[in-house]
Amino acid sequence: MNIKTRFAPSPTGDLHVGSVRTALYSWLFARKNGGEFILRIEDTDIERSTQQAINAIIDSMKWLKIDWDQGPYFQTQNLDRYKEVINQLLKNGSAYKCYCSKKRLEELRNHQIINGKKPRYDGYCRNFDQTKIKNQPCVVRFRNPQQGYVIFNDLIRGKIKYNNQELDDLIICRTEGIPTYNFCVIIDDLDMKITHVIRGEDHLNNTPRQINILKAIGARVPEYAHLSMIIGHDGKKLSKRHSAVGVMQYRDQGFLPEALLNYLLRLGWSYGNQEIFSLDEMKKLFSLNTVKKSASLFDQQKLLWYNHFYIKTLSTDYIAQHLLFHLKQMGINPYMGPALADIVTLFRTRCKTIKDMASSCLYFYKDFEQFDHQAAIVYLKPVATKKLQTVQAKLTNQTNWTLESIQDILQQTAHELKVSMEAISMPLRVAVTGTSQSPAIDRIIHVIGKSRSLKRIDMALKYINI
């Protein structure tokens, strides 16, 4: 069998982590089995679909390095095909036109709720003589079987059984003539020869209806796998209130694609106790057999842990490329300071996000106008004057600008003034960086350069003597 999977998002908003996990699992299943992965944009909700959302989907997939073999396809380019099948269903009696008004349907729903029944269409138009009604607005409903069961084997959940009596007649075409998502997806999967439909459990209730439609047109039924939902700490479906954001917002917050992919892979799937997976390992090891059925808890701290791991372990040049993006976003010219690789080396063990790293290294690329207020109160006191002057003089006379020579100067100053290294380094740190938090000050001075270091020490001395 030639395995084919697909990812079929709706372009009505940002691409969120739940959708990305679905895309990842579908992609990995195809890659593991030597199959094809298709990207399909389900844009039949014309009022809510936007080009911005389409761009966000494609940009997100590219950023995550989830590539596709075919597509992107768009449902709105296939409307004639959907209407062809709808007409086929109308002709063979597997579908019918429904003329029920919104008012009637609302009254029906309220009556069912009041009487403790599950809201569902009652089949009012199911047996109407359709030839007697003309030129009235209507929807088209699928005539769902009223007897028997729909039974299928979910590749994650096992055998699932639905009684057809529990299923109402699904709308497959709206009043304005636009086919519904639940119908279009069936025809697309059929025409694209999708063999495995991997999607979220929120689609589980659609599956028996879709299987019945496939049987009505004499088509094969694909394999199904429904992923458990992702929840927040309150046990509810993950949403914006849990700080869940779109994929490109994670990029903008300083997360690496490797971290997000690795975290989402483990959010519902495991391979022994292994936590870290390369892309090649993901493709080799992934299996639906070990995808868990229960809901997965989204843990922002765990995602940060993954991100910090990759910041520390991926190549310096690769991290520097991501740092370049964030510095440019902040309006910083990275060519007005030290090499980005040097910055990565200084900060990679301290910063959990690339945005953090960019914010922490700004003083390397632009001069600050004032010192951190609290740091200046504590460390830029008259008692620091002699220490800063001594270091300033020694740095001025230093011609061999190396890390070792700077370390020697700081040690010499501490020895000459009979003070601790901390008594030298803290006022010097505030002077050169503007803050009391930074990597080792000798490394900072070495990377930031002689001219800028001396200029800032002079600024600190003037601040003290105001």
UniProtKB/Swiss-Prot annotation:
User: In chain numbering, where does the motif 'HIGH' region fall?
Assistant: 9-19
InterPro entries assigned: aa-tRNA-synth_I_cd-bd, aa-tRNA-synth_I_codon-bd_sub2, aa_tRNA-synth_I_cd-bd_sf, Glu-tRNA-ligase_bac/mito, Glu/Gln-tRNA-synth, Glu/Gln-tRNA-synth_Ib_cat-dom, GluQ/Sye, GluRS_core
Residues that bind ATP: K240
Which reaction does this enzyme catalyse, per its entry?
tRNA(Glu) + L-glutamate + ATP = L-glutamyl-tRNA(Glu) + AMP + diphosphate
Q: Tell me, what is one Gene Ontology molecular-function annotation carried by this entry?
A: glutamate-tRNA ligase activity
What are its GO cellular component terms?
cytosol
Q: Where in the cell is it found?
A: Cytoplasm
Q: Which CDD domains match?
A: GluRS_core
Motif 'KMSKS' region location, chain numbering:
237-241
Where mainly found? cytoplasm
SUPFAM superfamilies (UniProt xref)? An anticodon-binding domain of class I aminoacyl-tRNA synthetases, Nucleotidylyl transferase
Q: Which family does it belong to?
A: Belongs to the class-I aminoacyl-tRNA synthetase family. Glutamate--tRNA ligase type 1 subfamily.
Role this protein plays? Catalyzes the attachment of glutamate to tRNA(Glu) in a two-step reaction: glutamate is first activated by ATP to form Glu-AMP and then transferred to the acceptor end of tRNA(Glu).
Q: Please identify the protein, giving its name as recorded.
A: Glutamate--tRNA ligase
State the gene name recorded for this protein. gltX
